[in-house]
């Protein structure tokens, strides 16, 4: 009935209206008609009368127009007892009067009105693309939802519908569009409609609740969008309309594209985003990790003679890479070979099902690591090369005589290390605050397997893996290279604690089958008999033909009619149902063909016209009655990935319950058998040819008689039962699937019974077996309510579907459970998964923000413990405009970053009802707004943790945390796992430096996190604080030609390369300083002159310790202001001041300028100051100088007047690191000889003040406990105890900067920047960034601007890992590196061993080797900073350094190096920089070229070759020795 009503929408109650009665019409007098309001605008002559009330008779389906349901319905009411005859006018009045409590329907609200189309160029707002004259649309108000529809009369075009919200034209627009009344913004929407101006369109008002989209898919490209920003973007899209191709802009920084909109199972071009709309984010710049299983099946041959692995390199990868190229993605890929070698020498066929091989070793070979797909040719070349080598690397054993006999063997795929492989990949996401880079979103894992999706696994490891994946925002796809099997896949077999064989289907593993055969209609055998194939039995030869004997049929029949009668009797006779004992549960693979019939179906010859997939009849539920179409997961029809079209890439689980194809499945089995085993059927039919005509007629009758579904239970069973045509009648059983939760063992849900016929002989088979249990025929009458009940009680930890018999077809309700609950929002309603499978590989989606997944009430009450804490906003945060609303948003934001999802389950209302004392019902919200944040409750859920967040009216936010019990005991059952790993540049396998099975994401200390968000944190130097971190270094690069000379104050200045780079650093620091975070009062007032006073970076050359010893009094603490704020207001002078007075103030005033002896490149400059300090001093002390430019002009005037001059008299007065000296006529105090630094101001008060400040700094930091040793070295601790008695010098500066000065964001966008306060131009300049809730795109824009600024001054900004290089393999096993041992040990070689050199610098030769190849120092070893020659502690603003080795960066930024204690070198590529700049639009034109990654690899390999080449290395060491003989200066220790 419902489907017919859809065809006659004008008969709905809301569309019926009372028509005016024409007394002279053919209807007769006293008649009234009800007619549709959906006719054309203003057209009354063609109205169709579908309902007539005449002479007390109601007639539906009049003589005009199309009759509803093809018939006329009448109801005679003349027999009703009424007081008087119903008057027609009274009837009309009564029908027009609204019923109490029901609003009267406005007849114009569903009427279409015609408008003429016009266009405008200036956008009114970001979400408004259509403007309309509201006065021309009756009943419309601003904010209502409307539909714009186009009608195309040409045969090649289709009608288009665009939804928009009513936005009125302004006065000027109405004047210009007086005749049109509707205007569309020029751009994508105009292109989408493809209509010229003044085209007619029709507009109709629509209901928001009835017309909201089901799913909107947004695509992200070339930027990192975290899940917190995804939530914010989803919130901004609420109550808006979107269309395909629309560019969505967030905070004027993030730009996303609407790629797909789904509604009611169809892909539409426009939709309304309502409360129930799911917004999904997919990435076009993701990190893809390919894990290729290397098993013995990789060397098997296919039917066409192709090796299995050749399918990977010749069809699968080229197809995927081509698809990426066509879409324009910027993925970076990592390819890993995963192999398990069996050293037992026994056949796996002797191992029982579900049991793993014991004597095995796992190997992981990193083929490529984070390489951009732009280098696809090099990727494929490396892939082919590595595959040819891996068999020799793993199976050849080295003997003493140098031989390499072949031993061992690869494990078969069924016994492979599938769970260990998945755990190996999850190590990359163990830390939720370790961002790979700022250019990529989403990490996706794709496993390529030569098998069929069946694996034997360890039970304990399976539980640990399921638990781990529930806490990570990662999706895993499995691509199988074999043909789809006849059982449920993916399928895990294991032995449980009772010693029984169990089968489980994981919900977190999505499987597909790759088929590169374009002839999809071609038949192929479904059973794999590899040994027979290799003997050539299955090959067709011209010279000879192998004949197989006919199969003996147990049915002794002489005609097709008797054959079918006997078949039906065996299937439908209840007396033939025999129980099957446990001993007789096996059958021969060749004879057990029922699964073949139920799985393999011929592909439909016609194209599917709608996006709703119509499945084959064998994918229907076997028990449940036919229902409305719904997308389920088919468990017995594995999909194939075909290289011909996107629709051919299917999932094992893609089917619908369709009202079509309801004929008997027993008959369908005969049809399928005819098409699958065509040869065998012909032989059977040839014997029974006399009765062929009766067979055809019987076939036609049966097919015709099953068009309509039947309600009788036994008839339903008769329709859906199917048995092999070769059944003997003695082994007919009914299989019973059982579903239960793995971790909720106390819960036993009722069995769900489905029918499935199986047949076979008493023969046994030694391969895969599935338990079969017999049930009575009456069990088939069970309803699907049991299944629904189980689904409702599905627990939080249920990520496996347990199966007693995986060969049985599932019902639709149970099949949907194979879609993981956390990822269900990714799939549109009523759309088969096969239509989204290619997008999973090309543009993977991020974990959805919301979920309906929640533990059952019984599970929640009994298995969770309760914790709570409260947090309120620090009053100090109010000066930045922060409120409780902002704190609540940040708390939800940070939890989304940690992998939580916002829960919207209906069970939450019951949870609230049982545990709340509130009188009014609380709102369970998913969107935060200022209207509801005081009354809404937010439930956030992750694997084993549930958070309930509620804001009270007093401003206190209460957090209730529910933690699952006994979560830490699962890991105790897992043995230590140490696989062998070989990275890209290594020559041999080595033990992995981490245990992939035990690396998991730990829960955060949420009380501490919330307190930090509220503004309660003690020190920026707390090393235990959480947050995101990025580290950058600035390296020298080529200087643009037009930068060497410039004009300052009318004077042409020519700068050296070093001076230009120092000027670039000063400009960068100036940019950072001016971006500092300001309070609201500071923003409201005019910028003071102290904003022009820039912090000083102390540049030096030579030894760091000598400089610190000489200038430690001039180093200011990181938290101190650049200058005293009050001094800027105590201006004493103006530009008319006398030079003599200025000279005195410069040397003897209250705040004199620092005049010191400075050493620069072995040249001493006595009694000088820096130009930057002079500019700061002028701004502080002159009332009529407000900017740095004015100070430079006045300083040039003082230099011209002779007050001071440049030390080399090469420059005029410049703002920067330029040395100047007061002219001799104005100097009256000489510097004391022999002192490294003698302040010209001998004021004891000033000196005491500086010393006192340093002492206070030391006491503060030592008392805070933040500066602690981590490595436990006793010598280091002793050195620290000595240094603690002295002062602490902080050699970097921290500043909080504002990432959003324009105020586009809805939240406070801030981060902390740490930069070096002491810098040697020969080394790297460091910038570190720390943030927590800032938008990554704003940070990326900030870094990009810094890179462009550096580029103009001959500098290169390079991102490097935050952690020390040697520690990276401990948390990222895929990161490649090289260990190089020098061919000459300079410490023992008599030719280079020199005690004098090693006394100054132990690693003199090593450092010279690195510097000669373009390396610059990045970090010193921490032990060097605890030098006995200095009596103070050296720390950074971000914490105390803990580097074990000295680290160097190559001047290209492409790779790094470390010097080990034994003199070996540790090299590794800088993947962060290579992947970031491979995109091609990062730091201006400094991005790497097309072959830069390959070039950097060549440079690194060449450097390693030099290290291992005796002659070349000896030449380099001789250069180092000559350099020492020439200088003989004290060397800086690294």
Curated annotation (Swiss-Prot):
Please give the Gene Ontology molecular function terms for this protein. GTPase activator activity
Which PROSITE patterns would you find in this protein's record?
DEP
Compositional bias, Low complexity, is annotated for 32-45, 651-662
Localization per record = Vacuole membrane
Pfam families recorded: DEP, DEPDC5_CTD, IML1
The membrane-topology field of this record reads: Peripheral membrane protein
Under Gene3D superfamilies, the record lists: Winged helix-like DNA-binding domain superfamily/Winged helix DNA-binding domain
One GO term under biological process is: cellular response to nitrogen starvation
Q: Taking every annotated instance into account, which residue ranges of this chain make up the domain DEP?
A: 1149-1224
Which residues lie within the region annotated Disordered?
19-48, 580-601, 637-662
| Keywords, alphabetical | Membrane, Vacuole
UniProt lists the family membership as follows: Belongs to the IML1 family.
Q: What name has this protein been given in UniProt? A: Vacuolar membrane-associated protein IML1
Q: Which organism is it from?
A: Eremothecium gossypii (strain ATCC 10895 / CBS 109.51 / FGSC 9923 / NRRL Y-1056) (Yeast)
Q: Which gene encodes it?
A: IML1
